[in-house]
């Protein structure tokens, strides 16, 4: 893929995730810039945003499952391949409206578009294991409550330990689950320019 080619939603999400990993960029700034550069419509922009934030919220869990079925440890994979696997795995596990076949096929095609045709077979094989086991994924390692919650909800262990100390295991798990929930889109109306009724009418007609 050349720099001048416009990207789709999945490629935009991948580019944003790679910028976050490589350059410690703010995810929202990277996303806004890439969405604007590639002129995504509102639907694709929302899809790219969901993929990017969803992967970030579940990164540790996704990497654990990738490691279950990949010959290489996730941290040793090329960043672009690791990102593609994370995006594919996230769609399979967390996005009911995305057909599993589409998640796998798009990941394979994205691998080829990124100039890694030799890795396409591996990406296909790993994500097919996600599909085969998505209702019964491998058990997480047995360990302390903090270790389990940190991996399950992809939060740093120091934070989990702090929460456990403050509110106990049940409240900690509830907080972590809520923190990973998909955030609803909200619209704030500028009363100096329009009214809530006018905005509602515009979107209903």
Where are these regions (language model features)?
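Class I Rossmann-like S-adenosyl-L-methionine
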Residues: 1-204
């Amino acid at each position: 893929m050349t720099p001048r080619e416009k990207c789709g939603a999945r490629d935009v999400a991948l580019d944003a995730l790679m910028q976050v990993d490589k350059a410690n960029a703010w995810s929202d700034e990277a996303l806004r810039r890439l969405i604007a550069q590639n002129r995504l419509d509102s639907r694709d922009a929302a899809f790219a945003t969901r993929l990017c934030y969803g992967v970030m919220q579940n990164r540790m869990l996704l990497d654990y499952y990738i490691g279950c079925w990949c010959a290489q440890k996730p941290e040793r994979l090329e960043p672009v391949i690791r990102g593609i696997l994370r995006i594919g795995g996230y769609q399979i596990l967390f996005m009911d409206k995305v057909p599993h076949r589409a998640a796998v096929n798009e990941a394979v095609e994205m691998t080829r578009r990124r100039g890694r045709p030799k890795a396409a077979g591996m990406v296909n094989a790993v994500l097919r294991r996600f599909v085969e086991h998505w209702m019964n994924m491998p058990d997480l390692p047995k360990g302390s409550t903090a270790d389990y919650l940190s991996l399950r909800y992809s939060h740093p262990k120091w934070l989990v330990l702090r929460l456990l100390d403050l509110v106990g295991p049940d409240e900690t798990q509830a907080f972590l689950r809520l923190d990973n929930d998909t955030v609803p889109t909200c619209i704030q109306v500028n009363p100096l320019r329009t009214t809530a009724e006018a905005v509602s009418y515009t979107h209903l007609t």
